[in-house]
Design a protein with these regions (language model features):
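Bacterial N-terminal signal peptides that target proteins for export
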Residues: 1-7
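C-terminal motif of bacterial Sec signal peptides marking the signal peptidase cleavage site
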Residues: 14-18
Length: 224
């Protein structure tokens, strides 16, 4: 074999060797890309398993039909009262509030996005038994609660100032309390504390006069 032919064979062997090395390098790259694709698919699968936030049922901000709740009052002789719940249908409920001096009825219509007051009457000592058509004909007087239940939500001069407050009451200590606040033209502050499953568990009225602070509260004490 001549020297030139031998050199030619050596060059071919080196070229084949180089090609083999390049192929060996490219194979892991494809494997890495495949692994990344699989990881991405796994992440997507995990995200798809994340539970969707449960829809808020505004009707849960009232007590059961026939429930009688007693509220302990401080700061005023009429701050203590009893509240009886009467459900008319799936989306309409009345609360009879008796403070020892008078009984006030408030009737609410519940929609997907709000709880609206549709009847309010003092000196009411009867049982309110309207037909569904009667209830549908009642106009909205004001809004009691409105979605979204997020800090900063406003409606009818009320502002949602807290959605996760802890509150101690004579009945029990509540977590996740929703706090609504309103300030009137005189500077007096009103607050309502709402809990899912119970509704209003506390109301508060604060007013400053000269250097004195006047506070009236009604706080849930018992439920029968």
């Amino acid at each position: 074999m001549s020297a030139f032919r031998f050199l030619g064979l050596m060059v071919l062997l080196l070229l084949f060797s180089a090609c083999g090395e390049n192929s060996a390098v490219e194979t892991p790259t494809d494997t890495v890309n495949t692994s990344k694709d699989e990881e991405t698919q796994e992440v997507v699968k995990e995200e798809s398993k994340t539970p969707i936030e449960e829809k808020i049922e505004l009707k849960n901000f009232f007590m059961r039909d026939g429930a009688v709740a007693s509220y302990l009052g401080e700061g005023n002789e009429y701050a203590s009262y009893q509240a009886r719940t009467q459900w008319h249908n799936d989306d309409t409920v009345s609360i009879y509030e008796d403070n020892g001096g008078t009984t006030v009825i408030r009737t609410y219509r519940i929609t997907e996005g709000s709880i609206d007051l549709i009847k309010e009457q003092g000196e009411f000592y009867e049982q309110f038994n309207p037909t569904n058509d009667d209830l549908k004909s009642l106009p909205t007087l004001s809004t009691f609660l409105k979605l979204p239940l997020e800090k900063g939500t406003t409606f009818d001069e009320w502002t949602l100032v807290n959605v996760d407050q802890m509150l101690e009451t004579p009945f029990e200590t509540f977590d996740g309390v929703i706090v609504l606040e309103k300030t009137d033209d005189s500077g007096a502050i009103q607050r309502k504390y709402l809990v899912e499953g119970f509704g209003e568990v506390k109301r508060e009225f604060l007013m400053k006069e000269n250097d004195a602070e006047f506070i009236v509260t009604s706080t849930l004490e018992t439920v029968e």
